[in-house]
Each structure stands twice: as structure tokens, then as C-alpha cells.
Amino acid sequence: MSSEYLIRSLLMLFLALFSANASNWLYLAKLSSVGSISDEETCEKLRGLIQRQVQICKRNVEVMDAVRRGAQLAIDECQYQFRNRRWNCSTLESVPVFGKVVTQGTREAAFVYAISAASVAFAVTRACSSGELDKCGCDRNVHGVSPEGFQWSGCSDNIAYGVAFSQSFVDIRERSKGQSSNRALMNLHNNEAGRKAILNHMRVECKCHGVSGSCEVKTCWKAMPPFRKVGNVIKEKFDGATEVELRKVGTTKVLVPRNSQFKPHTDEDLVYLDPSPDFCEHDPRTPGIMGTAGRFCNKTSKAIDGCELMCCGRGFHTEEVEVVDRCSCKFHWCCYVKCKQCRKMVEMHTCR
């Protein structure tokens, strides 16, 4: 066997593994809309889907625009939550959109999987409640009078349908190849933790009915939390994520804390297998790790957004730039606010 043939074979194997990453479907966010999908053939052309996701697409064509919105929601929330960290969820014009970061068993990958699974559940549920989908609507299982005395009415979010679709679509790659590998178990656990960030924070919203604003009758319905709340919950779980390893208990393979002194993780916690890189330098061999050169930093902060940590000890540039702010705002009857535009010079700091 020639060395050239061996190198070519290894390269093809690497590309196959890389392209089969379970989060590749996030590439749907790069599409302006998939609402124009009107037949099953179009599903074959959607980049980033594995074959079993293509089959789900063909059976659920009308749901795919909600999935696309979910993908964009996941990317936007990731970039918001990590805006002040060395890795800030920068995306690529390729699959996977976050690069090789999500192919490693790090806590960053754990966050991406959790927020992605949550985003599909959220977007599909919202599509159900808004009447976009023929296959689902409001949750009619919530009815009657509650123990607190109010009447269940209105449109309760059908979170059960959204979660079920997320489980079938997002989890399909891990389940199709079996659940015996440590990475498959990690991904499935974090997917479920992401969905629980919605389920465990469902809220009750109510409306009063009566004469002159009285509350003689109160009707209530169950609603999902804002997705920013979901992102905040998952980010907190990221900060406290548990490093785990695969262990066989009887005939079952399970993930357990690598440090036996740590308490076992719950279904709501994030877990990871490998330590994260420092993300300081751009690594052309690792797509998705952009480094922190040129990133803005906070000169006075001692946290991760501070120049000392963000710039990894390389120092930073400082320049004065002019910014325009609204100022001297006044309320005018009725009913608008009028502001002046004020210019001022501020110092901006960027990493070397």
C-alpha cells in the first residue's frame, strides 16, 4: 500500500467523520428561509442533514422552517452568552458552523448541543402555538379548573410536541449509531439537559375578566419562558459543568464524574469529557478557533472579558474613538420621547 494512498484514505475518513457531526444541521441557519420547501425532493438538497434527518424532513416538510429558525436562535443565543469570552461562537461558512470546536468533547461542545436541542424544541413549539403547523396546535390537555381556583383556558404552549420533535430530529445521529460511545452519551445527555431548561421553567400566564377591570374570573395558560431565560440557564450549567468518564455498571455503560469526590450530575446539568483549549491563538488546523487578536476587552475588568485574560497576556492596543449617544431625552405630550445626539470620545481597547 503506497503512502499516497494511505494519506488519501485517512483524509477521506477524516472528512467523513467531520461532515457527519451531529450539529451539522445548524447550517440550516445559513439559509434565508426554507419556507419555500413544498416537496420531499428539496429535503435532499438541504446541506448539513444526515440521511435519517432527510427522511424526517420529507415526513415533516412544513416543520422545517421552524427548525431553521431554531438553528438561528441557537447561534444567536450562543453568541450572546459567549460575547465576552475568548471563544465567542464565531461561525464559519461550512459545516459544522462552529468548526471543530463542536467535534471535541469539551464544555463548549456541551453548551452548543444543549442550546441547539432547546432551540428546536422552542421554535417548533412556538410554531404550534401560532397556528403555523397542521400537525399540532395549542396544548388542549391543560383544561378545567386548577387547584388554585383559576380556569385553564387560552393557548397553552404545546411543549410536549416540540420536545418530541427535537428528540427525534436532533438526537437521531447519536441514536442511529448506538449509545455505547462516551461521546454519544455525552451529546444525548446534554441535548436532554437543554430541553429541560425549557420544561423546568414553564410558567403560568393569566388574564383577568370582569367589570371595570375586576378579576371575577381568571383564565390561565402555560407558556414557555423567553429563550433568553433558557440561554441563561444553560450558560449557568456550562459554568458548573461536570467532567465525566465512561464506566460500565453491570451491563450498562454510563457517564460518571471523573473526580469521585464530586457529587453525581443530574439530568439538568451539562457534562463534558475533555478539557477545553485556551482559545488564545488562531489555529488554522482547528477551524472555529479564531484566537483573540483584535477582540475588544475591558481594561478595568478582572473577569474573562478583561484585557489581561482576554488577550492572554499579549497586551492590548488603546485608541480614542468618537461615539454618538442619545442624550437630554424629554417626554413630549402625547406621546413620544425626543432626544439630542451627543458626541463624545471614548477609549477602546483591542487585544494584540
Curated annotation (Swiss-Prot):
Subcellular location, record wording: Secreted, Extracellular space, Extracellular matrix
GO molecular function, one term: frizzled binding
PROSITE patterns the UniProt entry points to: WNT1
Database matches in Pfam families: wnt (PF00110)
Gene Ontology BP terms: canonical Wnt signaling pathway; cell fate commitment; cell migration involved in gastrulation; embryonic viscerocranium morphogenesis; habenula development; heart development; neuron differentiation; positive regulation of DNA-templated transcription
Stored Gene3D superfamilies: 3.30.2460.20
InterPro entries noted in UniProt: Wnt (IPR005817), Wnt4 (IPR009142), Wnt_C (IPR043158), Wnt_CS (IPR018161)
Signal sequence annotation: 1-22
Alphabetized UniProt keyword annotations: Developmental protein, Disulfide bond, Extracellular matrix, Glycoprotein, Lipoprotein, Secreted, Signal, Wnt signaling pathway
Record function comment: Ligand for members of the frizzled family of seven transmembrane receptors. Plays an important role in embryonic development.
Family, per entry: Belongs to the Wnt family.
Record-given protein name: Protein Wnt-4a
Organism expressing this protein natively: Danio rerio (Zebrafish)
